[in-house]
A protein has these predicted regions:
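S-adenosyl-L-methionine-dependent methyltransferase catalytic core, i.e., the SAM/SAH-binding region
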Residues: 1-219
Length: 219
């Protein structure tokens, strides 16, 4: 089996120099080590439309328009370089909902981190490689922590599964099975128990999915 734990490392979060934490006073970098750009560069150089797309698609931020408008205004006056600057912009743009536990900055920070580190493409590349190397009967297990990751995993497992694929009825039988790499996929999500969440609060958003490899060769 191959297991993917897509959670952000606590060591990275606690390293305030990387700019992942809202509490950081450092530069807003968000680079995990391999990225060619920083969040600082994105915030100060990307167009208004591109910034809105990043926040909407990768952060699922419903108030992306307001936040980006204020980012543009702020950077026209002074370069956005620190986490505290971005936090201030977001807090001015969004009303705090005391009924929700999530910080108002969470979705924007998530979107920038995913974009800077190309996390979605890295996930796709990873599970594709795993499909190639896992033998028949082996499992590919993925623990995701937000809906974007989960949607990618669900789509991948479903699309290449025996019971979910819908090939054309006009294709020959061997072609119908050519791109089926998993046995009947059970789309049930495994979530952490109440005890796990109490002992490990960051696990509250975790979702585990797995698929069982069949004997078809991955070419």
């Amino acid at each position: 089996a191959i297991i993917f734990d897509l959670g952000l490392s606590s060591f990275q979060l606690l390293d305030y120099t990387r700019g992942f934490s809202f509490k950081s006073k450092s530069k807003i970098d968000m680079n995990m080590g391999l990225a060619s750009i920083s969040a600082e560069y994105v915030l100060n150089n990307y167009s208004e439309n591109n910034l809105k797309l990043i926040l909407k698609l990768l952060g699922e931020e419903s108030e992306a328009h307001k936040i980006v408008k204020n980012i543009i205004k702020a950077r026209d006056v002074k370069k956005i370089s620190t986490v505290s600057q971005l936090v201030e912009i977001i807090e001015k743009s969004k009303k705090k909902d005391y009924k929700k536990k999530i910080n108002v900055c969470t979705k924007t920070f998530q979107a920038l981190r995913i974009f800077v580190n190309k996390e979605t493409s890295e996930l796709i590349n990873g599970i594709t490689a795993a499909t190639k190397f896992v033998k028949s009967g082996g499992k590919i297990i993925v623990i995701s922590f937000h809906s974007i990751e989960d949607k990618i995993v669900k789509y991948y497992f479903t699309n290449y599964s025996k019971n979910k694929s819908n090939p054309s009825r006009y294709q020959p039988e061997e072609k119908k099975n050519e791109f089926i790499f998993f046995e009947n996929y059970n789309k049930k999500i495994i979530k952490p128990s109440t005890d796990e969440i109490i002992n490990n609060p960051p696990s509250r958003s975790a979702k585990l999915r797995f698929a069982i490899r069949n004997k078809n060769e991955f070419k």
